[in-house]
């Protein structure tokens, strides 16, 4: 739909800007200390480092927590570039996870290969894209109305001409719209990645075993 195309156009433009910024921090001559980055950029690099850990590229068990550079990274006084280069030098990085045919022996080549891996990964990573969308929404670049209408465009909600018209004319706010859909379980917490996604509770009389209450969601 036109609405989907408009949102994707906004996202694609912002994504290219973000990827360029990440590349500059990883490969540029003057990378910024993590602590001096804005909240958005910190979120991107926190995600990148966490992904390297989860994929066992940055080996948590190998990291020396007393290492001076590691502690500087934890305190935000050095850049991701410096931290990752140091991690390579200290053998905290498993290079077999991202090198293919060529045997890398030079630390610069290893770092370049790691950067290429990171950039290829985040360019298609859903979790990373969600962070971009989060800040687009916070900045108002993508509106709540657009997101609500996309729920119809993508079949998450059954087509309802009256409700769509209300959204388009601003007769109903996106917040009120979503609250109503969640209340009626047309949209579940699980779809919004909210906890609890499901749950149940059973209350009995401990003396008699009598069932007093039973409830579940959804």
Protein language model annotation of sequence segments:
Residues 1-218:
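Periplasmic/cell-envelope proteins involved in peptidoglycan metabolism and beta-lactam response
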């Amino acid at each position: 739909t036109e609405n989907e195309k408009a949102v994707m156009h906004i996202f694609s433009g912002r994504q290219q800007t973000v990827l360029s910024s990440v590349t500059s921090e990883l490969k540029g001559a003057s990378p910024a200390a993590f602590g001096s980055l804005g909240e958005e950029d910190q979120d991107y690099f926190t995600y990148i480092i966490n992904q390297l850990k989860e994929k066992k590229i940055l080996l948590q068990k190998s990291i020396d927590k007393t290492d001076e550079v590691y502690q500087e990274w934890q305190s935000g006084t050095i850049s991701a570039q410096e931290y990752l280069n140091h991690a390579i030098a200290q053998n905290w990085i498993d290079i077999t996870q991202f090198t293919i045919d060529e045997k890398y022996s030079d630390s610069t080549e290893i770092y370049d290969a790691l950067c290429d891996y990171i950039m290829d990964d985040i360019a298609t990573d859903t979790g990373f894209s969600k962070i971009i969308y989060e800040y687009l929404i916070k900045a108002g670049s993508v509106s709540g109305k657009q997101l609500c209408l996309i729920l119809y465009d993508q079949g998450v909600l059954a087509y309802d001409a009256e409700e769509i018209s209300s959204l388009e004319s601003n007769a109903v706010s996106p917040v009120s719209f979503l609250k109503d859909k969640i209340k009626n379980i047309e949209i579940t917490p699980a779809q919004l990645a909210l906890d609890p996604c499901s749950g149940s509770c059973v209350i009995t009389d401990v003396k008699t075993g009598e069932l007093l209450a039973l409830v579940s969601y959804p």
